Amino acid sequence: MRDRLLAAEKVKAIDWRDGALHLLDQRVLPFEENWIAYTSAAGVAEAIRSMVVRGAPAIGISAAYGIVLAARARIAEGGDWYAALEEDFMLLADSRPTAVNLFWALNRMHDRLDRLKENADPLAALEAEAIAIHESDREANLTMAQLGVDLIRKHQGNAQAILTHCNTGALATGGFGTALGVIRAAFIEGMVERVYADETRPWLQGSRLTAWELANEGIPVTLNADSAAAHIMKTKGVTWVIVGADRITANGDVANKIGTYQLAVNAMHHGVRFMVVAPSSTIDMNLASGDDIPIEERDGAELLEVGGKRVGADVEAFNPVFDVTPADLIDAIVTEKGIVERPDTAKMAQLMCRKRLH
């Protein structure tokens, strides 16, 4: 399976080369494939904030490389570069509030800095750590893909229809994808007849990114309006809803792209299984439940402007980027450490005590 998954890789969104972070600008896909090179932490923070790069794992990886760029600049300035670097950590941490992978990656970079031996090269150590974060996410993607396929096969091994939301593929990660990685692997195994992709308003990650990724790999994909999901579950034989996550709390509640919660409610009503796929770096054991997750809200103009024109002068918009799906609506959480079925606090704690499977 691993070799076939690697052979199927066609898309990547993050490239570290020649001392710069190169990001595929996801704001203009699929109409343009435009790579932007970043050489400063401020540039990387803005790329995260403006959604040049998006997807929780990809954000964390980008932030790690951002610290490498920051350290290079601070060391070149001279003086107390270590203290000055704290400003860059804070700048990157403030770029997106909900995706915990961002804070996980920054904490890991900070820990590596704190563990530097005397006379060690800090820049080389930080670069090696960022590359390790990138590579570990790629390996986690491969492990989760296999585990997800095993779970699908456990319940129903024949070709089936799957519904997904937002974008959780190579564009959102450092490798093959989380939820979309499972879907890709299931297709390779002959277990996917068709994928229904929610358009995912207002940024249209489903129509612009997911449909593009799947079509590029020859996986049958049907794009649908977000509001059609329940009807599709009822009439199109969907057996699984498979999504990613931006943060998972200690009790198994999941914050993901806005619209995920209603998918879980509809899946429960229609007897459709609901799978969340995310690396263990997405799990925040410091938060007891989804009630504690900060939910990012973006500019209402994303909803109020149609074709470049405002819909109404007196109309207000509520534009949360994420919602929280309660654990009791989730059939399984798949991570590189293993699978938690019917998640709860005890099962999540047990999962996080395990070593990685890859």
Swiss-Prot record:
Which EC number(s) are documented for this chain? 5.3.1.23
| Catalytic reactions of this protein | 5-(methylsulfanyl)-alpha-D-ribose 1-phosphate = 5-(methylsulfanyl)-D-ribulose 1-phosphate
Q: Which keywords does this Swiss-Prot/TrEMBL entry list?
A: Amino-acid biosynthesis, Isomerase, Methionine biosynthesis
Catalytic residues (UniProt): 246 (proton donor)
Keyword Amino-acid biosynthesis listed? The answer is: yes
Metabolic or biological pathway, per its Swiss-Prot or TrEMBL entry: Amino-acid biosynthesis; L-methionine biosynthesis via salvage pathway; L-methionine from S-methyl-5-thio-alpha-D-ribose 1-phosphate: step 1/6
Query: Which GO annotations describe the biological process of this protein?
Result: L-methionine salvage from methylthioadenosine
Q: Which domain of life is it from?
A: Bacteria
Chain positions of site Transition state stabilizer: 166
HAMAP family, per the entry: Salvage_MtnA (MF_01678)
Please explain the role this protein plays, according to its UniProt record.
Catalyzes the interconversion of methylthioribose-1-phosphate (MTR-1-P) into methylthioribulose-1-phosphate (MTRu-1-P).
Classification via PANTHER family: METHYLTHIORIBOSE-1-PHOSPHATE ISOMERASE
UniProt lists the family membership as follows: Belongs to the eIF-2B alpha/beta/delta subunits family. MtnA subfamily.
Query: What is the name listed in the Swiss-Prot or TrEMBL entry for this protein?
Result: Methylthioribose-1-phosphate isomerase
